[in-house]
From Swiss-Prot:
Uppermost EC category: transferase
Active-site annotation: C115 (proton donor)
Entry protein name: UDP-N-acetylglucosamine 1-carboxyvinyltransferase
Family per record: Belongs to the EPSP synthase family. MurA subfamily.
Highest taxon listed in the record's lineage: Bacteria
One term of GO molecular function: UDP-N-acetylglucosamine 1-carboxyvinyltransferase activity
Length: 419
């Protein structure tokens, strides 16, 4: 398995170009199954999960090509089962189910894999599709959905806010007969982006970005061209990289209005921040950040995917900061690794109390999930000495060329190829 070797400490400064959002690109790629004509999707990041999705769409019979953009022609799809060997590495595969049953009247997806953070059940996806008229069976490790004729529009009140289930219901409802209303819908920018993509193909979706989404079913979706929005979590990660090192950064191809909660906390930490239509700059003027209190919440609250990075910020900040994780259980797995590097923290159920130290020291650490591993790499950039980050396949699932981008900011980081 590959590792990163990071030599520190370094002050990170310079420019970085942000990639397209993985968490928008994935639902958009799966939603392309609804289209009877070819679609071109631009600004798709080059990541393992994206490659897996393209392979999965090909196995279903779609024509998939990548040359700059990703081109998908789902016209010839004639296989309706997403097999275990592809699904096991990526839980996003469940997003194939709604489009398959909506367009072809049948679909099966193996129960998914992915990051090891907490329980992420598929129940909400299943109950949403059932309310649209699909018959669901769980057999031999597969979720099997079928419907005779078209799905039927429904008024669906979601038990809890779920990004994944909102995508499933919204995409399936585009081809349902009648109108579907989703109450307590997720409001994330990636949901808005997926809805805008579907509308570009001829869907009739309104209210995306609010907690009430309305979908008027249409007979078919055509082709189109769409550009995926920038990755707000990658943007936030690089802003934190500059903040913890007293540095200065300009993020290009960014979308500031998707990061309000994160930018507010960075300002609280003492960062000087400016924004334009598609850029964000941060300058610490060489200062250490101040500790901040963070409580994760569904959008527009503070994103759980930025929690590990802000935990690290607090661990090297002036003062004490409290991090409360309300979205996923089991999401402080990076803290014991950071303690090996000299950090001071206590964990009490879903709360981490972080006492800032002036300097971390390099150590051998192990990545456990995607965002936790990013925080370990950033810790290595500012720690005294050498840090080895093991199991970095987690990082490759969510960050495009993170080592190249960090090197451009002055980091001393190398990928060490595994045996």
């Amino acid at each position: 398995m590959d590792k990163f070797r990071v030599q520190g400490p370094t002050r990170l400064q310079g420019e970085v170009t942000i990639s397209g959002a993985k968490n928008a690109a994935l639902p958009i790629l799966f939603s392309a199954l609804l289209a009877e004509e070819p679609v071109e999707i631009q600004n798709v990041p080059k990541l393992k999960d994206i490659d897996t999705t393209m392979k999965l769409l090909s196995q279903l019979g779609a024509k998939v090509e990548r040359n700059g953009s990703v081109w998908i022609d789902a016209g010839p799809v004639d296989v309706f089962c997403a097999p275990y060997d592809l699904v096991k590495t990526m839980r996003a595969s469940i997003w194939a189910l709604g489009p398959l049953v909506a367009r072809f009247g049948q679909g099966q997806v193996s129960l998914p894999g992915g990051c090891a953070i907490g329980a992420r059940p598929v129940d909400l996806h299943i109950s949403g599709l059932e309310q649209l008229g699909a018959e669901i069976k769980l057999e031999e490790g597969y979720v099997k959905a079928s419907v005779s004729g078209r799905l039927k529009g429904a008024h669906i009140v979601m038990d809890k806010v779920s990004v994944g289930a909102t995508v499933t219901i919204m995409s399936a409802a585009t081809l349902a007969e009648g109108t579907t209303i989703i109450e307590n819908a997720a409001r994330e920018p990636e949901i808005v982006d997926t809805a805008n993509f579907l509308n570009a193909l001829g869907a009739k979706i309104t209210g995306q970005g609010s907690d009430r989404i309305t979908i008027e079913g249409v007979q078919r979706l055509g082709g189109g061209v769409y550009r995926v929005l920038p990755d707000r979590i990658e943007t936030g990660t690089f802003l934190v990289a500059a903040a913890i090192s007293g540095g200065k950064i300009l993020c290009r191809n960014a979308q500031p209005d998707t990061l309000d909660a994160v930018l507010a906390k960075l300002r609280d930490a003492g960062a000087d921040i400016e924004t334009g239509e598609d850029w964000i700059s941060l300058d610490m003027h060489g200062n250490r950040p101040k500790a901040v209190n963070v409580r994760t919440a569904p959008h527009p609250g503070f994103p759980t995917d930025m929690q590990a990075q802000f935990t690290l910020l607090n661990l090297v900040a002036e003062g004490t900061g409290v991090i409360t994780e309300t979205i996923f259980e089991n999401r402080f797995m990076h803290i014991p690794e950071l303690i090996r590097m000299g950090a001071h923290a206590e964990i009490e159920s879903n709360t981490a109390i972080c006492h800032g130290v002036k300097q971390l020291s390099g150590a051998q650490v192990m990545a456990t999930d995607l965002r936790a591993s990013a925080s370990l790499v950033l810790a290595g950039c500012i720690a005294e000495g050498t840090t080895i980050v093991d199991r970095i396949y987690h990082i490759d699932r969510g960050y495009e060329r993170i080592e190249d981008k960090l090197q451009a900011l002055g980091a001393n980081i190398q990928r060490v190829k595994g045996e």
